[in-house]
Amino acid sequence: MNKIAKTVLMTGTALCAAGVVLSTAGYFAGGKDFTYTSDHMYVSGGNSSSRKNLTVMKKEQIDDFTKLNVDFEDFDLDIRTSDDDHYYMEYKLEKNGRKNPLTWKDKDGELTLEESAGGSGSYYITYDLGIFSTHADLTEKKDALNTVVLYIPEKAQLSEAELQLSDGDFAADQLLCKEMTLELLSGDLMLDKGEFEKFDAKLSDGDLNVKELQCTDNMQLKSGNGDVTIKKAELADGQIALSDGDIQIDNSSFNGDMKINSSCGDVSVEMKNGSAEKTNIYLKATDGDVDTEGLSRGKTDNEEDTSVYENKAGASAPTLNVECSDGDITLTESEK
């Protein structure tokens, strides 16, 4: 046997031995939880042992409720419009062991949903042994996996909703609620239509996308790292604060005193046609520009690092105050 052949043989033998050692170590380190599905091996992003290790609730009618409390660690929450006048719930959740990952109680008009320690994430890795390739498939949650779905009648209004999601998204077709409190530590908020009296939302790391928002009393929004987009807004008193991200509010009207503060990012506000001249407006951009082209009233003052625009409409008029520390401010009016 020549020298090259011996080298190849010795290398192959060493690699095979290393593979056996690593496989054995992996087995006792948790690899025994791997399951074969369709000639593939599957590993959940948590410690779930199988795709089949799920707890499933098919769409089922639940008691009516006017108060909603949610406390999730990894799950998403999706609120959809019911096809009738009844309330429903469904979910398909991965389990970590035998414990049900969700506990819920619907009593006296109050629905409480809590994620237990038995839940797991929805990201997974698949090893395709058939073609000897490995790939990480960080998928979107398909078929509502690890998502709790609630169905609420179209005209139903909640009196209170308190939602806290640590690592999950919140989405809703429509949500009518008198007092809404929401905290997302790492996740996005997606809302087609929201009508509230009081709206208090905190997003640490995620985007907010709302198609239509109405807040008749007070709105408080704090965003740490993410963009805020509202396509249509009717707002009264409130404050919007962004640490790092852009904000865009289109087709908007302000009926109270609204303050917008951005530490790092651009602010773009489109007001309804003809409403700017009837609003007390103060815009200040530090290390940025203020663009109010197209507005017939108000005055602009530009200094070395600061741009200011101001319009005075009277003491009884609503107020819009926007300050931006590192970014531009754009204020326009919609077309007629």
Where are these regions (language model features)?
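Positively charged n-region of N-terminal signal peptides that target proteins for export
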Residues: 1-7
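Short linear S-[DN]-x-LW-Φ motif typified by the pepsin-like aspartic protease active-site region
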Residues: 26-116, 122-123, 141-164, 169-183, ...
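Acidic/polar low-complexity surface segments
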Residues: 122-141, 294-312
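Loop-centered beta-sheet repeat module
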Residues: 180-184, 199-202
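Short, surface-exposed interaction patches in beta-rich subdomains
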Residues: 192-194, 199, 208-223, 227-336
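Hydrophobic membrane-insertion alpha-helices, especially the h-region
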Residues: 9-26
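Conserved long hydrophobic alpha-helices within structured protein cores
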Residues: 107-119, 284-295
